[in-house]
Amino acid sequence: MTYVVTDECVKCKYTDCVEVCPVDCFYEGEREDDFMLVINPDECIDCGVCVPDCPIGAIKPESPGLIEWVERAKDFIENKGWKNITKKKTALPDADKFKDEKDKFNKYIGSVKIAN
């Protein structure tokens, strides 16, 4: 099992969670404005310590309905070169504006396809 970062993180990217992770399993794109964080499912130890630190509730335990988020995380890390993040950074500039919006991945990032 692993934890996954879900749609709530898209266009917000609060990073409170990364500093509490005991195994440093969070990743981000190289650009400052990359749209979200992901958890490396091969590194996550399923401790859940990050969950209460996410101010928008974007981190959830893996479940059948969230498998697509596990696959996206793997794709971003393995095929798009996302790098490990271990220190808290400022959230994206419009994070407060987008934090309550639903279905953000499909609206704004849907063109990002998972590699086969």
From Swiss-Prot:
[4Fe-4S] cluster binds at residues 21, 44, 47, 50. PROSITE patterns: 4FE4S_FER_1 (PS00198), 4FE4S_FER_2 (PS51379). [3Fe-4S] cluster binds at residues 9, 17, 54. Keywords: 3Fe-4S, 4Fe-4S, Electron transport, Iron, Iron-sulfur, Metal-binding, Repeat, Transport. Residues 2-31, 35-64 form the 4Fe-4S ferredoxin-type domain. It comes from the Bacteria. Gene3D superfamilies: 3.30.70.20. Its cofactor is [4Fe-4S] cluster; [3Fe-4S] cluster. Binds 1 [4Fe-4S] cluster. GO terms for molecular function: 3 iron, 4 sulfur cluster binding; 4 iron, 4 sulfur cluster binding; electron transfer activity; metal ion binding. Signal peptide: none annotated. Ferredoxins are iron-sulfur proteins that transfer electrons in a wide variety of metabolic reactions. This is Ferredoxin. It comes from Rickettsia conorii (strain ATCC VR-613 / Malish 7). The lineage of its organism: Bacteria, Pseudomonadati, Pseudomonadota, Alphaproteobacteria, Rickettsiales.
